[in-house]
Design a protein with these regions (language model features):
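Short, functionally important structural connectors and interaction interfaces within domains
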Residues: 7, 12-14, 33, 255, ...
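Secretory targeting and sorting signals
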Residues: 1-29
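A broad structural signal for short, well-ordered beta-strand segments within beta-sheet-rich domains
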Residues: 24, 131, 202, 414-415, ...
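Divalent cation-coordinating acidic motifs and surrounding scaffolds
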Residues: 276, 280-610
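Extended non-catalytic accessory segments flanking core domains
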Residues: 29-308, 312, 316-339, 425-429, ...
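Secondary-structure junction/capping motif
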Residues: 3, 34-40, 364-368, 548-549
Length: 610
């Protein structure tokens, strides 16, 4: 331990700001004036027993400093822990402005104990115990840091979280922590403490916010390409952990990593919690990325007698996007999807994107995309879509996202039946015993409350080698508003699922109406369902054996089209009627696992012999 450092001008400024007080002695003092230590104010539940109370001269060592963002401050850890594994020895000290302490300082902190809910209490997140309105006394500098707690398979339980207390609205906040039993209890018992991971596999690629995800339990549900598959509400992947850096990116660029890469060496820093991923290792020291060599996939070309039907969410595409985005998306269609016969697109925006001036037409968006496909060596697709009523289909304000069909007229024809518009519902009729759409393209039940502020399904009738095929393109309601997996209420409240369940009922009912007219009708339902193959909405689509979800034809390790918070998961689906058998099906991984993406979704294709 060193003698106190010369504080000089830094302390003068900090004194003026009320963030720091002059040392009272020349040696590090680990005794609290009022007897309160960090583990006392943290307590053995998720809520501090001292919340709202003032504390005086809480001692500890500074283990991390955050000088950027809206949550500036530092982490304080007591080098003399108690014997209770449920009580954290670390705490965040919120200073509001850039703190002037340094890592390794021995300090005492006086202030108010608070519980901060990232994103606001209504968001459902757990709280972070903090000391606010602090007065900080630097006692000495250059002290050794408390040894990090190593997070690995042996330390982190497979079980994720206990069920909440029914008497408290299923809240877990007041439950005694059981860090040996549940991963979220372990992480909470380490909140604010110095932790370490070593040689960890990346399961969520570096994002635009300089974050990535690793797993400290690589044996849990591995994907075929190095990720971690989310396959059940009851079986969470407890080893997922978000990594951020305490070093501003202007000083040290954040590493670029793809799924399957390894963050080699040690990554160490305080364990934080935020609304963008829950428990987060805020690294003082970052490991080095070792590439796994992940490459974008390419599917095979359809055979002459195979109808290739694909779906691709192109993430808010509009003409103002850089040409490079159009070119990359086009390469996805031509090179990686092998130019399918029909492509259902989601998130096509209107001709001026997010400019909210009443524009709803998207012909410029679609034609620019088709031109890019031709330039990439693909066919000059034709397109069909229906412009929505302005501002009624959700998505980015002003963008008026909708689904659209691209089709290769050299291989497949579209059966046009006029009259389809934003508000006219399509219905099923019989044409000499064959199911036919009243309008094509048409929208399913656009006036139903299930589709309020959401994209209406787009139905179209195609013909391939003389055989009619009805295709329904979907983009169900988003998961916005759902509580996070780390929510303080368990089981997690998935409020958005109600809307998607209603939408599934609508689509399933429409398909069954088709089959009531023609039992062996050829029907493809596809798109961004925004829900999992095991979800209530996903299962409801298949009710009555009206459809088969092709995701279930894949091995569990291959079932994903999207990566979120380190979970590789199914959001995009292709479902087919029983008359189409079991098509050759491929989710083509070109985006979701990569730091450099053309879209946040992977496309997929089914090759069908009608």
């Amino acid at each position: 331990m060193t003698t106190p450092r010369s504080i000089g001008a830094i302390v003068t400024a900090a004194l003026a700001a009320g963030l720091i007080a002059m040392p009272q002695s020349a040696t590090a003092d680990t005794s609290a004036a009022d007897g309160v230590r960090v583990h006392d104010l943290q307590g053995a539940t998720r809520l501090s027993p001292l919340a709202g109370q003032a504390v005086t001269a809480v001692p500890g060592i500074v283990t991390g400093v955050r000088t950027y963002g809206s949550s500036k401050g530092f982490w304080l850890q007591d080098p003399t822990p108690d014997a209770d594994p449920a009580t954290s020895e670390g705490v965040f000290v919120f200073t509001s402005s850039a703190p002037t302490v340094a890592v390794g300082d021995s300090v005492t902190v006086s202030g108010t104990v608070s519980e901060f809910y990232p994103g606001g209490k209504a968001a459902g997140d757990q709280s972070v115990t903090e000391i606010t309105k602090p007065v900080v006394t630097v006692v000495s500098s250059g002290n050794a840091l408390p040894a990090p707690v190593v997070l690995n398979s042996a330390a982190v339980p497979a079980a994720y979280v206990p069920a909440g207390d029914p008497a408290a609205g299923n809240s877990i906040e007041a439950l005694p922590l059981r860090p040996a039993a549940y991963a979220l209890d372990l992480y909470e018992s380490l909140e604010g403490m110095n932790v370490q991971v070593a040689d960890t596999r990346v399961v969520g690629a570096t994002d635009p916010y300089s974050e990535l995800w690793v797993t400290v339990r690589p044996e849990d549900n591995p994907s075929a390409r190095g990720g971690t598959v989310y396959g059940s509400y009851a079986n969470q992947n407890s080893g997922r952990l978000q990594i951020q850096s305490l070093v501003p990116t202007a000083q040290q660029p954040f590493p670029t990593a793809n799924v399957g890469d390894v963050l080699t060496g040690t990554t160490e820093g305080p364990l934080d919690y935020n609304q963008f991923g829950g428990y987060t290792l805020t690294a003082r020291t970052l490991g080095t990325v070792a590439s796994h060599g992940l490459q974008p996939e390419t599917t095979r070309k359809q055979r002459k007698d195979e109808l290739a039907v694909a779906t691709y969410n192109v993430e808010n595409l509009d003409p103002s996007d850089p040409q490079a985005k159009f070119d990359r998306l086009a390469a996805g269609v031509v090179t990686h999807l092998a130019s399918p016969d029909i492509v259902a697109l989601e998130e096509i925006q209107d001709n001026n994107g997010a400019v909210n001036d009443g524009t709803v037409a998207a012909d410029q968006t679609l034609n620019k995309f088709i031109d890019a496909i031709v330039a990439a060596g693909g066919p000059r697709y034709q397109w069909r879509s229906i412009d929505p009523t302005n501002g009624t289909d959700g998505g980015e304000p002003g963008g008026n996202i909708r689904q659209a069909f691209l089709f290769n007229a050299a291989r497949v024809s579209f059966t046009d039946r006029p009259g389809g518009d934003a508000t006219t519902p399509v219905w099923v009729s019989s044409n000499h015993g064959r199911a036919a759409l009243s309008v094509s393209p048409g929208r399913i039940a656009p006036g139903d409350s299930a589709w309020a502020d959401s994209r209406k399904p787009l139905a179209g009738e195609f013909s391939f080698r003389g055989k009619p095929v009805i295709v329904i393109a979907n983009h169900f309601a988003s998961k916005g508003g759902d509580a996070p997996l780390t929510s303080r209420v368990q089981p997690v409240v998935r409020s958005s699922e109600t809307k998607r369940l209603q939408q599934s009922v609508q689509v399933n009912t429409f398909v069954r109406q088709i089959q009531a007219v023609q039992k062996d009708a050829r029907v493809v339902v596809l798109g961004d369902i925004n829900d999992y193959e095991f979800s209530a909405a996903g299962l409801r689509l298949t009710e009555g054996r009206a459809l088969k979800d092709l995701a279930l034809s894949l091995r569990p390790s291959e079932r994903y089209s999207y990566v979120y918070q380190g979970n590789s998961q199914v959001l995009d689906h292709i479902l087919v009627s029983p008359s189409l058998g079991t098509p050759d099906y491929d989710v083509v991984h070109i985006n979701a696992e990569f730091a450099d993406q053309a879209s946040d979704h992977d496309p997929q294709v089914a090759r069908i012999r009608p």
